[in-house]
Amino acid sequence: KNRFTRALYGSHTAFRLETSDRPVFAAYTKKNPKHICFKLQTSGGTVALDSTEHCESRYTAGRRSYNLFHPSFEGGNLSIATLALPDKEGAIWQFNARNFKGSNPILLASISEIRNSKLNRNGDMGADPADSFEAPLQPQQLQSCPAQIDGTLYILLENQELRTLTTAEGETLFKKAEAARSETASRIRIETPDPYFNTLGGTLAMAADGIWDGEVWLHGAIGWRMPLSGWRAAYTGDVLGWHDRARTHFNAYAASQVTEVPNTLPHPAQDSALHLARSVKKWGTPQYSNGYICRNPHRNNQMHHYDMNLCYIDELLWHFKWTGDLDYVRQMWPVITRHLAWEKLNYDPDNDGLYDAYACIWASDALYYNSGAVTHSSAYNYRANKTAAQLAEKIGEDPTPYRNEAEKILKAMNERLWLPGKGHWAEYQDFMGHKRVHESAAVWTIYHAIDSETANPFQAYQATRYIDTAIPHIPVTAHGLKENGYATIATTNWLPYSWSVNNIAFAEVMHTALSYFQAGRAEAGYKLLKSSVLDGMYLGDSPGNFGQISFYDAARGECYRDFGDPIGVASRVLIQGLFGILPDALNQQIILRPGFPDDWDKASVSTPDISYRFTRKEDTDTYHITQRFQTPLHPVLQINARKEKIRSVKVNDVPATWQSIESAHGYPLLSIQAEGTSSTTITIEWEGAPLHTLAAQEPVIASNGKLALQIPSGASISQVYDPQSVLAKHTMGATAFNAQIKGEPGHHTFFVYTHQGEMDWWQPVNIYIENTRKAPSYTDFADIRPEKCRMIDFDRQLNASVTDIYQNEYLSPRSPYTTLQLPTQGIGEWCHPLLSATIDDSGLRSLVHHDTFQTSLGIPFRLKEKGNNILFTSLWDNYPDSSTISLSGTASHAYLLMAGSTNHMQCHIANGIIRIHYADGTSQATELINPDNWCPIEQDLYVDGKAFQVPAPRPYRLHLKSGKVSRDLGKELNITGVYGREIEGGAGILLDIPLDDSKELKGLTLETLSNDVVIGIMGITLQ
């Protein structure tokens, strides 16, 4: 177990003091990390302080404290407090001894080298061995520092050595360190009815200070402690009021933008040494030319493999909203325009308004879109162009090209990426092949589209409902946690696992929570945010941690502490989500849209820019706002209506008006505006009945079934908005709403326009449409009759050996543009461009006798002992797109032995299709969908029923090296772990397709639909 789990940061260097749940410590410097431990010698004996019978340990925003009791203390008590020094690399301990009998106790302090001298990620949790900071069994550099504790004792760590201090010297240093800690921690102060949230302000500020190196925001405070131009750490500067730090960061990376390398080399510019998976690092290519922002500050000659421009620019645009500094807008205008031109050149070269995503978000590793039209990157570019147009107007530049581009992007997103029948955005649309839409969206697709302001209120509500119903939720539980119903989320529902594709990552969870707040769904946002707070900050191994990966992540477990990405997002979700502070200093206003749970009767927040306090007493809500912006902004309070009428609204005791804003989250949204003064008090008095909800639960209805909703007394409805087309017909009366339901099975939403008292609002109605299609009356492979099996001979159509699949070069068709794409060997991705897998069918071939292989299920297949043994199809030019095999006679089942490739980018979409043709001209189709009935030949899917789910029963797979058949080949072959799960030799898949035995068969067509994959048939047996 890793005992060194809570780091304390002081100066803005890599130094940190590692603390534990018991008083044992480590001091990290890159060249000379140390282990520090203490013993206490008393008249009752000597005890190591990390072994006392009683230890109460606390972490308080940059300070670690302990309260110790032990039998040898004979009633005495030892308390310890430790801090990192604020102005140099070092730490200080304060020991207070009380009620010890006899002579004063003696503290025995020891410092030595650490056990693991070769740290991979600076000794971070989950990345380096758990015992890295323990003392060696035989220390070679042991230093001891004994001292008597006469009331209070101070120990100083300086230059990686321990020494005692005089009481006066110790008090001075300790007070100085405590004052610095307190100043940082108190810049964000939060008070709510939820005690789990009241610690967040100071803890967040300390973590944010830990990723500041004096010039830029870092990728992480511990592991990955390095500068990066992108990802979400830099949001924290403005949100937490460090506008000076924010500007320093933005200036440092503005100086890293390429300005003197024109694009002289055309698309595509792929790296042949890396099997065309990613762009070649060569100056003058579209990617490495003017506008590109390099990874390190003040260096515009250093290539990196991510597009970090998008996130950097988004953070910069938020900086303008926080400060309203038009002089700085003018200074940075060339940076923005070069960026926008660079994005267009690289990622929308066909000028269709939708952008490819080239490693432009944290979850980029293993993501590749092959020049596709991607929601999250298009959304980023929409907001950037829309905001650029607004900025241009303010500084006298031409806004037209940026406004036109923004309008073009939004129109294309709504026409091509929004799924009206499903109510969410697609992940992407293929550029190549059939240009199909990949509907199974990741959470980053939803939250980026909402965060970048591409959604109207109806879209935002529907899209967050997709997260409710389609994204895996993992319960957050703990012994003693009284409150139930908390759950964190996976980033996708994709298989197979690959790093950053399906993880439980704190920044992703919190950004999703932010999207709930932005969609008006405060209760859901609060519940998800609290689930993440409980998971990472209270139940995890590191108290107060803003870590990268959750304990609930099946692949990595709890990993990396105080990581830049979650610190930046936590800053936003807390300040901009829960407290709803949304400045627009460019337009001299600040929106306050609180996201408090309905049962909160008070809450307050204080930042360097603004404070506000909310109180509720019976029917009166009061908001007291204090601004500290350079020029006070006009507050615009946006709140959900509580009741059907408003008795009064007052601003600074003067009657004021309110307006209604269109919303779709289930409550009337009201807006109250005030003048820009340093202090504002807004009071709302409600009256009348509480607002009624038409459908609090989600009714389950059959397609073509009927829905009846009672309209409560005092309410009425006048309109219906049915964006998902689930209402075949409906009637609205004074007391009831009745509808006949149509549409695809699954979760759906429509909206009704509701009136009650003074309030008018759109109210969502969620329904679940049952699948009433006749379920198959069989279980696959449950009716095998070997004596009736007839093997099909299609030897002449066999065009490959199954072992060829990853031995080929798949060179065409390829995108004409620079992109991230599948490597030429047909497996891997841009982070693993040289990955391959050895397919070995020797065992299977050895079991073939007289062209027949007998499976353990009793089904025979015609296979070849030598030569070609599979008919491959693919959209790659290596094989035909489709192939038809002649059939005759009648049969009730077609048993297929198949093998081929797939990957996470082709999950939950038909990779291929099998069509059975009958002599009468009719046909039936079976789609091959990863992971339902199609799996990658080289690996076993990790399934845990949580983040990784597949329908039951799992398909039978056939081990090519041994001939074994199993629905759980991983268990059969003792495959462990989550990532890779290589099947030695590979495995095929068995399908049972029920047929209409009253019809004469004509043929079977296999067609590949997905661009990446190769799909083959090895054997067909009719029964």
Please state what every model-predicted region is.
Residues 754-1023:
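N-terminal/edge-of-domain interface segments
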Residues 1-68, 163-188, 193, 342, ...:
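An extended acidic
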